Amino acid sequence: MSVVDFIQAITENKFGEYVLLGALLVGVFKLTVFILSVTSLLVDLFVLPATNLKTYGAKKGKWAVITGASDGIGKEYAFQLASKGFNVVLVSRTQAKLETLASEIEAKYKVETKVVAFDASTDAEDNYKSLGDAISGLPVTVLINNVGQSHSIPVPFLETENKELQDIITINVTATLKITQTVAPVIAETVSKEKKKVRGLILTMGSFGGLLPTPYLATYSGSKSFLQAWSAALAGELQSQGVDVELVISYLVTSAMSKIRRASLSIPSPKNFVRATLNGIGRRNGAQERYATSTPYWAHALMHFGIDQTVGVYSKLANSLNLNMHKSIRARALKKAARLAAEKKD
């Protein structure tokens, strides 16, 4: 039976005609949604102008709190927010690095700074008290939850050292939540006092490791996936208080954590990644199907959108590809470690 004969047979039956019409309407609907998603993606990435950070108090004497501020992406957030006219509270582990960075920012951008030495791996209440004391009375409108840790190399979950496991959970999850509980009330109070003439902003750094379940990075992957759900839930809670909450998803960025030194089209420098993030606040970019989430860097956005529209983030195929990739990375890392150990003996 040809396709024409099949369709003719269906249309001769009223029920079959309705089924065919229903299938056609579903197809048209899905195609329309896809076209709208692609259009929104391209407009977000390449058409809309940069977000005006005056919405969040830039050049109005307001403060931004940045965690993990002494290196990499966190340091770049500090530079770029200061360049936009925010005073900055720099939060990181090493006091000396923080003081050097604060002096550089004050000299270059003529803004005020404060530093808070904070070891996020310890979960010590003194840390949160020190942070709370530092921001008490300040008109804080922005929090950048940047502090984070991954595995030293890809590792099977059953072979993960207890300290590494505990540090990842404490830094990525516990510290992020407690820091937000410390800072968010100050942001909400500032917005309220300003009668919502400015808005508050909480950006939390996510990862493709949280977007896609990632074998051999199971603990890190789980911690970032947790942040994804938590951040979206928090966005719903704080919206009525004039505070925008957004999870920022990235693939690889040149940094100490990724161990990648050279930038490329798909792997931006911290400077380019942070610029894309700040320019695109409030837009989903590659995260077209996710609430209060953005994948801002254009190459990462296209990758995210492509995965969502094809294999899906939770598919067996995506999991298998991730497994094989990280097995290979682990094998190379172990081989390199063995070579360096042998050279050291010689």
From Swiss-Prot:
Pfam families for the chain: adh_short
GO cellular component: endoplasmic reticulum membrane
EC annotation from Swiss-Prot or TrEMBL: 1.1.1.330
Location within or outside the cell: Endoplasmic reticulum membrane
GO molecular function terms listed in the Swiss-Prot or TrEMBL record: ketoreductase activity; very-long-chain 3-oxoacyl-CoA reductase activity
Function: Component of the microsomal membrane bound fatty acid elongation system, which produces the 26-carbon very long-chain fatty acids (VLCFA) from palmitate. Catalyzes the reduction of the 3-ketoacyl-CoA intermediate that is formed in each cycle of fatty acid elongation. VLCFAs serve as precursors for ceramide and sphingolipids.
Family affiliation: Belongs to the short-chain dehydrogenases/reductases (SDR) family.
Protein name per UniProt: Very-long-chain 3-oxoacyl-CoA reductase
Originating species: Scheffersomyces stipitis (strain ATCC 58785 / CBS 6054 / NBRC 10063 / NRRL Y-11545) (Yeast)
